[in-house]
Amino acid sequence: DGYAPIFAYIGTEGFLLDAELREGKQHSQKHTPEFLCELLHYGHKMTDKPLLVRLDSGNDSADNYGILLEDGSWFIVKRNPRTESKEEWAKHIKEWCKNPQTPREGKIVYIGTTWKDVTYTVEKNGQKEQKTIRMRIVYEMIERTIDKYGQILLMPEIELNMWWTNLGWSDADIIASYHAHGECEQYHSEIKTDMDVERLPSGKFKTNALVLDYPCIQHSQS
C-alpha cells in the first residue's frame, strides 16, 4: 500500500517543523494527537508568538481540538460532514445567510458562520475529564444552476465546504487562510522530487523512516 508521510511546516517560507513516515493503509487521524502534541512542543520552542494550526478534513477530530484548545493555539480545520445530509445543510444555510453573492448568472455563493457543541476529553493527574465547548463553523456553499460554459443544469449543483475554527476573523479571511495552506503541496513536491525521495529504497519501514529524515533536515536548511 506504499507510504503516507505526514509533514508539518511553520511560517510562510516552508520550514519543516516535524515529519513522520506512515504506512499507506494507516488512517490519517491515527497517532495524529501524539504528532500534534509533538509539533506544538517544537513550535513553542521556536517562537513565543501564538500558533495557528491548519489541518485537512482527515484530521477533523475532537481529540485534536481538545489538544489545540488546551494548548491555547488557534486553528482552522476542514470539516468532514461524514454522514450529514448536504441537502439539509443547504436548506439551513439559505435561511441563515443574509447576504448571498451572485458573481455571475446561475451561481450563488453563501458564506457565513454557525455554531455547534463539541465534546473532548482531557487527562489531568491520571483522571479523564470531558469538556464541552461551543465551536464556530465557517461555511461556504456554492449553488450553480448554470455552469461556467452557460449550460443550464437540470438540477442545481451544490458545493459545500465548512471549517472549524476558534479564530475571530471574518468568514472570508478564515476561508482564504485555509486555502493558502495549499502552498504546502509545493513543499511536499520539493522534498519528494528535488531531494529524490519519490520512492524510498528499502523494504523495511524503519529504514525508510530514517532515510526520510535526511532530506527533511536538508529541506529546512536550504
Task: Label every PLM stretch briefly.
Residues 77-187, 193:
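An anionic, glycine-rich sequence signature occurring as long contiguous blocks
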Residues 45, 65-74:
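Short, surface-exposed basic-aromatic patches at helix termini and helix-loop junctions that form
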Residues 2-5, 70-85:
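Acidic, His- and aromatic-enriched active-site or binding-groove loops in soluble protein domains
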Residues 1, 14, 51-60, 75, ...:
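Short, conserved catalytic/metal-binding motifs centered on acidic residues
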Residues 1-46:
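Electropositive, glycine- and tryptophan-enriched low-complexity nucleic-acid-binding patches
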Residues 53-61, 81-84, 206:
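Acidic, metal-coordinating catalytic cores used for nucleic-acid/nucleotide bond scission
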Residues 61-67, 86-90:
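A short acidic (Asp/Glu
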Residues 171-178, 194-210:
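Short, solvent-exposed helix-loop connector elements
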